[in-house]
Design a protein with these regions (language model features):
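Noncatalytic luminal/extracellular "stalk/propeptide" segments of secretory-pathway proteins
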Residues: 1-115, 157-163, 169-173
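Short, acidic/polar
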Residues: 86-90, 128-135
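Acidic glycine-/aspartate-rich tracts in secreted/extracellular proteins
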Residues: 109, 151-152
Length: 174
């Protein structure tokens, strides 16, 4: 019904079809439902700890693989995971992240500072968004990206991620 309504409205406004003789265009989509293992074990030279899926971490991916498995992967801390030449900032400088998992902080380095012009201060820039961090990690050759959540710089509690990312998501079909 919605498509019929929109098509009727377009015609009544005198708009010409934009896809040959049709007002409609097929948009192939894919549905992805990420599910994490129940545990993630992290080992460091100083010890190890275990994170519980959904309670301590959630996952997300736009990859359409049937299964993505990370086992015995190397983690590399990459600050905020940002390359921003206009701010003379490069968290990846001198880091080898190829085929590793980068761990980055949420938001950007301007948050909580006194300079409102540095990464726009407390106003999150595109560099602070999760999508940018995933894209930059991929550009740097990383296998994946883990974003460390912190409620204050994120602007929302972890429960928002638990509620929103534990469900199916629609993406354009690659």
């Amino acid at each position: 019904k919605t498509l019929e309504y929109l098509e009727t409205q377009f015609k009544s406004l005198g708009l010409a079809p934009g896809n040959g003789d049709s007002y409609l265009q097929e948009v192939p989509m894919v549905e992805i439902t990420p599910t994490a293992d129940s545990l993630m074990q992290v080992k460091t030279p100083d010890g190890e700890f275990t994170l519980r899926g959904f309670n301590d971490f959630v996952i997300n991916s736009e990859r359409t693989d049937d299964e993505i498995v990370w086992r015995d992967e190397r983690l590399v801390f990459a600050g905020f995971g940002i390359v921003a030449p206009e701010y003379n900032w490069n968290d990846y400088k001198d880091l080898d992240v190829r085929d590793k998992i980068v761990v980055v902080l949420v938001n950007d380095p301007g948050f909580g500072g006194d300079d409102s012009t540095f990464f726009k201060g407390n106003t999150m820039t595109y560099y602070g968004r999760w999508t940018y961090k995933y894209e930059e990690a991929a550009r740097q050759g990383a296998k994946g990206c883990l974003v460390v959540h912190n409620t204050v710089p994120a602007g929302y509690p972890f429960q928002v991620l638990q509620n929103g990312w534990n469900a199916a998501h629609l993406y354009l079909d690659p």
